[in-house]
Every structure is written in C-alpha cells, then in structure tokens.
Amino acid sequence: MKVAIIGATGYGGIELIRLLEQHPYFSIASLHSFSQVGECITNVYPHFQNVLVHTLQEIDVEEIEKEAEIVFLATPAGVSAELTPKLLAVGLKVIDLSGDFRMKDPFIYEQWYKRAAAKEGVLREAVYGLSEWKRSEIQKANLIANPGCFATAALLAILPLVRSGIIEEDSIIIDAKSGVSGAGKTPTTMTHFPELYDNLRIYKVNEHQHIPEIEQMLAEWNRETKPITFSTHLIPISRGIMVTLYAKVKREMEIEQLQQLYEEAYEQSAFIRIRMQGEFPSPKEVRGSNYCDMGIAYDERTGRVTIVSVIDNMMKGAAGQAIQNANIVAGLEETTGLQHMPLYL
C-alpha cells in the first residue's frame, strides 16, 4: 500500500520515513514539504543516503491522490485542519499527528490551542487513535487523530483504573517528563543546549494542550471523572517520556489485585509491557521502540496507587503509534513493521 508524508522534514516526519522505509507492506510514494520543495531528502538529512531517494514535493492533493492511499500529516497545529478536508474529499485516508482533530468540542480546542478549530463536520468524523483502546473504531476510520505523546503515556497508565471505577474521580495527578525532541525541531531559548544541559524545566503549568485531550478520553470511560492535575517538565535527553501518575482508591486494595487488573487489561496488547511487582521502567528501556512499559505500586498508608509509564515520544508517542494505527486500518497485525528492540545505549 502506497503512502505519502506531508511535513516530512520535521522530527515526526523523519521518524515516519525511517519506519515506513523498513515496513514490509507500506511503501513511500511521496514526501512533501512546505519550505524545502525540490530538495532531495538526503540533502536535508544525510543519514538517509543510500537508503532512499526522494525529492521533496509541493502539496498537490490531486497528485497525491494518484499515488497514495494513506496520507500521514506530520504538520504543525492549524495546517492539518486546512489540508484534511481536501484529502478526505478525494478518498484518501488520513492519519494526523497534530492536535487539530483530537478534540470533539471546537470551543475547547480554541480555548487550549489559541487558534480556530477545524470544521465541526470533520471533527465529528475523526477517531481518536489510542490504538489499544480504540481498535474497532480505528479499523473503520477515514481520519485518525493520533494522540499526543504525553496523553498516550498518561492514558495508557490511567484507563484501566478509570474503567474499573476503583479510584476517586477527583484524585488524578499526573507528573510528566519529556526529552527535548518532544518540543519539536524549531529551537527555542528553553531547548537551547546551555539552558537545558544539567538542568530541567517545568513548562505550561496547568495550561498544557494535552490536558483536555486526556480529560475527554477519561470521560468516555467514566462520566464522573473530574479535572486532572497535570504538569510537564523538559529534561536533558533527546527522546523519551516518563509519566508518574497518582490516584486514590475508593476502598482498600491489594497490590496483587492492581497487578492483575493491568495484566488483564493489556493481555492482548503486544506493545504494553507490565513490569513485575516492585519493578519500575525507565525511558532508556523503550527508546527506539513502540513499547509502553509500566510499573505499579500501592501505598496502604495513603490509599494511593502510583503508576509509572514510559514511552519513546517519537515512537509510541508519535510515528510508531501512527503506523500502528495504519496497520489496523489496513487489516494488518498491529506489530507489522514495528517489532524493533529498544535501543538501550
């Protein structure tokens, strides 16, 4: 099956290229850029030399429709909202890595993203692409809104608790830390090496755009869920996310019950790895892979559950999950082309 990538020169775009070039079923028909049309991708990223030869093309929907069946959008917020209706109109399936179609309520999108929302008709058509929790809907979708990286790590960690109804609905606290690639390719003062090296920073306190995305998904599984407390930090690693999540249980639990809850929730999910009791993952253990690793603890003194969830923000948090969703759409095994062992070093 032929695919096209729009926004091929950003970090999400080049990770899609790396994965799709090794995929046994999908093949890249075309790469598209806004600012580097006519450049060979190997001139922009020499690490692709002798691996693929593609010239970056302008975005011509009619030409894309002739060559591809699925389009991956690795574009900034706002761009996908403009392009997607045109792509859908010619029968293309779209997997969007931006946040433009994650929120069903356009008012909430505009409140958090500070820009105009996509058309409501297209928003209604979009399926939120959290692969392990939306398989049947993804299978039939024409437009998939790939989840945000923080939202992916957090939701995979909390949804078994929310679905089971065993936690206090107003008790969810999420502390999240991300490598600097999560901030995107465009440099800022905060991501400048002297500012970040030997340092860490909290940012977007109570204002991160993944907050409503997480809350929307939690409400699908429990309408009583209250607003969450969510903080994000930038740490001096290139890729990786660690989420530490806390919630208070409604009644006394045994750690064995919680362990069983998670093992059963994800027993059919090849990319979710639950650690043995008392063990907790770190970002290095999933780097370069599509895995989400989790560890579980329960504090009898406070009645709080602690879940530690780690992903590679460029893989399970972006390009990897996008291809997992494409596999579902195409009727393939979810693991097709994604069976990469983590790069520990």
Swiss-Prot record:
It is found in: Cytoplasm. The keyword Cytoplasm applies. SMART domains: Semialdhyde_dh. Its EC number is 1.2.1.38. GO terms for biological process: L-arginine biosynthetic process. It catalyses: N-acetyl-L-glutamate 5-semialdehyde + phosphate + NADP(+) = N-acetyl-L-glutamyl 5-phosphate + NADPH + H(+). SUPFAM superfamilies: Glyceraldehyde-3-phosphate dehydrogenase-like, C-terminal domain, NAD(P)-binding Rossmann-fold domains. Keywords: Amino-acid biosynthesis, Arginine biosynthesis, Cytoplasm, NADP, Oxidoreductase. The active site is at C149. Pathway: Amino-acid biosynthesis; L-arginine biosynthesis; N(2)-acetyl-L-ornithine from L-glutamate: step 3/4. Disulfide bonds: none annotated. Coiled coil: none annotated. One of its GO terms (molecular function) is NADP+ binding. CDD domains: AGPR_1_C (cd23934), AGPR_1_N (cd17895). One of its GO terms (cellular component) is cytoplasm. Catalyzes the NADPH-dependent reduction of N-acetyl-5-glutamyl phosphate to yield N-acetyl-L-glutamate 5-semialdehyde. Belongs to the NAGSA dehydrogenase family. Type 1 subfamily. This is N-acetyl-gamma-glutamyl-phosphate reductase. It comes from Bacillus anthracis. The lineage of its organism: Bacteria, Bacillati, Bacillota, Bacilli, Bacillales.
